[in-house]
Structure formats: structure tokens, C-alpha cells
């Protein structure tokens, strides 16, 4: 789970 920017949820 990568969460760089508030909006990406991979």
C-alpha cells in the first residue's frame, strides 16, 4: 500500500 498524495490509495 503506497500513499504518497492524499487521493492515491494503491
From Swiss-Prot:
Domain of life: Eukaryota
Molecular function, one GO term: hormone activity
Record's subcellular location: Secreted
Sorted UniProt keywords: Amidation, Hormone, Neuropeptide, Pyrrolidone carboxylic acid, Secreted
Modified residues (Tyrosine amide): 10
Disulfide bridges in this chain: none
GO terms classed as biological process: neuropeptide signaling pathway
GO CC terms, sorted: extracellular region
PROSITE patterns named in the record: AKH
Main location class: secreted
Function of the molecule: Hypertrehalosaemic factors are neuropeptides that elevate the level of trehalose in the hemolymph (trehalose is the major carbohydrate in the hemolymph of insects).
Name by which UniProt lists this protein: Hypertrehalosaemic factor
Amino acid at each position: 500500500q503506497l500513499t504518497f498524495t492524499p487521493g492515491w490509495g494503491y
